[in-house]
Amino acid sequence: MNLMLQNLNNIRTLRAMAREFSIDVLEEMLEKFRVVTKERREEEELQQRQLAEKQEKINAFLELMKADGINPEELFAMDSAMPRSAKKRQPRPAKYRFTDFNGEEKTWTGQGRTPKPIAQALAAGKSLDDFLI
């Protein structure tokens, strides 16, 4: 709870702060607190109603499943029994060719970190187009 809310929650602090305001201002603040409290109650009631409706729907589906002879655990068993097809992404084709520091010719797709030999050549003024395959 932040400091302002702690002050509002402490009766002695409220009394001390109230001395600085007129009764009209205090009544206006009180009305605003009532409005905020009412809105908050309505929000919580709405959430409770939505949760109750959701639970009723779940119970209705469970009853329908029991009436048809379907056990809820069977649904989960079916889901785990089916193998998931993980899509294997094809590797990207090489886009650039360069010679590394050991004299070996290597390729780079253009994805990820720029290899050091290419980065040094770019810093020296070469263009990336010079390395295109």
Curated annotation (Swiss-Prot):
It comes from the Bacteria. SUPFAM superfamilies: H-NS histone-like proteins. GO terms for molecular function: bent DNA binding; DNA-binding transcription repressor activity; minor groove of adenine-thymine-rich DNA binding; protein dimerization activity; structural constituent of chromatin; transcription cis-regulatory region binding. Residues 81-115 are annotated as: Disordered. GO terms for cellular component: cytosol; nucleoid; protein-DNA complex. It holds the Pfam family Histone_HNS. Residues 111-116 bind DNA. Keywords: Cytoplasm, DNA-binding. Its main location: cytoplasm. Disulfide bonds: none annotated. Forms homodimers, can interact with H-NS. A DNA-binding protein that acts in a fashion similar to H-NS, repressing gene transcription. A subset of H-NS/StpA-regulated genes require auxillary proteins for repression; these auxillary proteins (Hha and other similar proteins) may also modulate oligomerization of the H-NS/StpA complex. This is DNA-binding protein StpA. The lineage of its organism: Bacteria, Pseudomonadati, Pseudomonadota, Gammaproteobacteria, Enterobacterales.
